[in-house]
Swiss-Prot record:
Residues bound to L-homocysteine: 132, 380
GO terms, biological process: cysteine biosynthetic process via cystathionine; transsulfuration
Protein name (Swiss-Prot/TrEMBL): L-methionine gamma-lyase
Organism name: Brevibacterium aurantiacum
Pfam families with a match to the protein in the record: Cys_Met_Meta_PP
Domain of life: Bacteria
Length: 406
């Protein structure tokens, strides 16, 4: 049990608390002592230093990836920020990680992980498609000095080289919701660190570090924030990787803005409730859509036959709130479908309160190589918090209209 006035010492030992409690109280240490109930938003871009010597020492300490020492000056917002640190502490606890490092966007987080691998002399990456289109594009261009081998899950071990720095997977995968067996991937990777994009599941449904992953990445813009009003990325990992990531962040200036940190940290407090509500709706929607003649196949982990390896229960605690579907009429049918939706919003992104629909091959996965791009008939749906009947009515009406227009 948590004592009534224990927020001074909260986070000292929270390992015995349930995830729902961690989401509410994580990163809240010291609030009672400060006389406040919620964290303050510190917008300072610079911080006073006591003298030249200690200021210089603090600067060097933080710029090389260390965390702020008690009593030291943070010197400059690019090096360390208190609200960002609170968000990091909260997310690390949820992912069973030693630490977490937050960034301005999810792509900034991915960039930092790749740069850390390059700087360590291990620029080769093994990646399993599909991935988020931005991640795929970044790897394919080699812009950061990386080289990539695209491998099937079963071929990871044979793809690893002496200079392989990371194995990168996303599960469920964006946009098709393919499932990856993390135990199998970690075993195949051997001593090579595995980075898992956990954006679709969130720590509510999946904790990759518990399966041996070294780094867990989130586009915090999505479910963690949950309201479509703050951008950010975050990686939960061990202390060694966290130090390397903070150094890259300090050098590249990719720190999450304090206002974004506040909103994303606040979003964590309702994450479990939002995620489970959206998941319930998604499961029912997937079944209704699966029966529609305009759809050739619905991809949703919770549907019968779509989890042949039994990852639900063993790796994931639920099917999540994302749905992918393939329209029998291909691109023309897909385009007509999304353009006939009224309640459901035609937009990229995901994980917010409202339901979003988009055509990945035209938008989020447009830069992906033709051989790996999603099919022209595939649609991605991020299920929100609306009533399931209202969503079903809108989607089925749009499907019917697209068939009539064919």
């Amino acid at each position: 049990m948590i004592a009534v006035n224990s927020r001074n010492s909260l986070n000292a030992d929270m390992t015995s608390l349930h995830p729902e409690t961690l989401m509410v109280h994580g990163g809240m240490k010291g609030l009672t002592e400060a006389g406040v109930h919620v964290p303050a938003i510190d917008l300072s871009t610079t911080n006073p230093v006591n003298d030249v010597a200690t200021g210089g020492d603090s600067y060097e300490w933080l710029a090389t990836g260390h965390t702020l020492k008690d009593g030291d000056s943070a010197v400059y917002q690019r090096l360390w920020q208190p609200g960002v640190a609170r968000f990091e502490t909260a997310l690390a606890g949820l992912e069973h990680a030693e630490e977490a490092v937050a960034f301005a966007t999810g792509m900034a987080a991915m960039t930092a992980a790749l740069l850390a691998a390059v700087s360590a002399g291990t620029p080769h990456i093994v990646a399993v498609r599909p991935l988020y289109g931005g991640s795929d594009h970044l790897l394919e261009t080699g812009l950061l000095g990386t080289t990539v081998t695209w491998a099937k899950e079963a071929d990871i071990a044979s793809a690893i080289q002496d200079d392989t720095g990371l194995v990168i997977v996303e599960t469920p995968a964006n946009p098709s919701l393919d499932l990856v067996d993390l135990d199998s991937v970690v075993s195949a990777a051997g001593n090579v660190p595995v980075l898992v994009d956990n954006t679709f599941c969130t720590p509510v449904l999946q904790q990759p570090i518990s399966h041996g992953a070294a780094l867990v990445l989130h586009s915090a813009t999505k479910y963690l924030g949950g309201h479509g009003d703050a951008m950010g990325g975050i990686i939960a990992t061990n202390a060694d990787w966290a130090m390397r990531l903070r150094q890259v962040r300090a050098i590249t200036g990719a720190l999450l803005h304090p206002m974004g940190a506040y909103l994303l940290h606040r979003g964590l407090r309702t994450l479990a409730v939002r995620m489970r509500a959206a998941q319930t709706t998604a499961g029912e929607l997937a079944e209704r859509l699966d029966a529609h003649p305009a759809i050739s196949v619905v991809h949703y982990p919770g549907l019968k036959g779509q989890d042949p390896r039994g990852l639900l229960g063993r790796q994931m605690s639920g099917g999540g709130a994302m749905i992918a579907m393939e329209l029998a009429g291909g691109f023309d049918a897909a385009r007509s479908f999304v353009e006939h939706c009224n309640l459901v919003v035609h937009a990229v992104s995901l994980g917010g309160a409202d339901t979003l629909i988009q055509h990945p091959a035209s938008l989020t996965h447009r830069p992906v190589a033709a051989t790996a791009k999603p099919g022209d008939g595939l649609i991605r749906l991020s299920v929100g918090l609306e009533h399931v009947d209202d969503l079903a009515d809108d989607l089925i009406a749009a499907l019917d209209a697209s068939r009539a227009a064919a």
